[in-house]
Structures are given as C-alpha cells and as structure tokens.
Amino acid sequence: MNDNIISRWFAAPVLWFALVAALFAVWALMEPGALVNAFDQDGHSPFEIATLPFFAAIVPLVWWKCPFTGSRKRRFVLCLAVSIVALMAIVKELDLHNMALHALCPDYVGEDGKLIPGVLFKPNGRPLTGTPFKARFLTNGAVPFGAKAFVVFYFAAFFGVFAAGLLYFAIPFVKGVFSLDPVAWSVGCFGGSGVLVQVADRLPSWLGHSHGLEKSAAGVTAAQSLCTALEEAGEMMIAIFALLAIFQSWYIHNRGKNV
C-alpha cells in the first residue's frame, strides 16, 4: 500500500469533495425525474440497493481488520458497537423498522411507517402525525406497550450506541483533527456526510414552497432532485468513509508488521 495515499490526512477530504463533485455532475446531466427514480424509491432504487453492500461490508471488515488498540475486551466491545450501528443502518435503509412497527400496531401505523391520521391525538386534541419514532408516540397512553418497547429498543440500539461511541472518541477525535491524523479526518468526513444527509433531507421543508423547491406541473424540480441525490448519496458516503477509517486505522497501527 502506498503510504503517500493511505497515511495522508487529506486523503479523505479529497475523496469527499471528489464524490460531491461527481454527484453534481450527474445531477447536471440527468433529468430531475430520472434522477429521483434512480436515487430514491423507498429503499428499492438502484442507488439505494447499491448502498447496502457498503454498510454490510463494515461488519466483516471491522472484525477482520480491527481498527482499535488495547485489551482484547476493549477491542471486542468497540467492534461489537460498530457492528450494531452498521446493522441498524441497514435496517433503516431497508425501512425494516417501519415494517416491524406496522406489524406490531397496524391500527396506528400505516404500511409506509407513518402514523395513521386521526387515530392518535396530542394533549391539545390535534392529530398525532408523521413518524412514530418520537417522544409523543412513547408518551401516548393509547399506544400498545410492545410498540413503545420496540421504539425504545430501536433508539437504544442505533442512536444510543452511536452516541456513546461519539462521546467515547470525542477527545481523541478533536486532537486527531488538529494533529492532522488521517483517521480523524476520515471520521470527520463520515460526520460531514451525515450532516449532508440531514440538510438535504430537511432543506425542502425548511424552504417550503419558495426558492423553486415546490413541485411543478411537470413533476420534480431540479432543486428537489438535487436534494434527493445529496441525501441518498450522502448515505452511501457515510458507509464509504466508515470503511476508509476502519482500514486506515488498522493499516497505520500495523504498518511495518507482517500482517
């Protein structure tokens, strides 16, 4: 392996900007409707399907090329945490959590994973709508215990483990960024991809029907297709930079060894 590539701090940022530039090039060349169909079909588009192997590869890679140091117990716990988050990301990508919740309480949750309007209500009497993965769903007395337990488990397994990992590595990450550690910069690009996904997901609703983001008579606008492409591609980039950080860390720790 070329040390000038894998061991340089700027490897991940260069790759991040190259991927975003390629995405904008694809957006500029494709019709908005065709781009949306290629990137987003509720887990069944070609791009969404292509994203799954990247997340799936995280699990075997983190055990095969363990990126962590320390005792065997520490390495096992950290590898297990990474595996759990990767598996939960696959669950989210395939919308399996929505399917499971619909199966648990079909009277409250529709097949699309959204709350059925007019069934559950807020304390002020207004209908409870949107995703069931929020506090108001958990505190509603009409929701079955099994559904509440599933939502709590989902948050604990995904966001809980992920948040614990962020807190555990927060200080080493900040130090690594300022010391130009390549793994820290790969993790930073991982986080930047996550921010990209969240911004692209919420941007249309933030801007509402202004700035050309409303649906036109012809269908999807160019701005809407860009947001869709950024969101879906950002999810693939999350997996790519997770894989890069894992391999970089393993390689740097074992450089010079016969591995």
Regions from the language model: what does each represent?
Residues 41-49, 111-153, 220-233:
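Short aromatic-rich membrane-water interface segments that cap or initiate transmembrane helices
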Residues 194-259:
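C-terminal transmembrane-bundle signature of multipass membrane proteins
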Residues 16-34, 198-201:
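Alpha-helical transmembrane segments of multi-pass membrane proteins
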Residues 89-107:
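Transmembrane alpha-helix/helix-exit interface in multi-pass inner-membrane proteins
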Residues 74, 78-88, 176-205:
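Alpha-helical transmembrane segments of multi-pass integral membrane proteins
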Residues 3-6, 64-78, 171-182:
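Membrane-interface helix-boundary motifs at transmembrane edges
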Residues 1-19:
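N-terminal membrane topogenic signal
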Residues 50-64, 152-166, 233-249:
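Hydrophobic cores of alpha-helical transmembrane segments in multi-pass inner/ER membrane proteins
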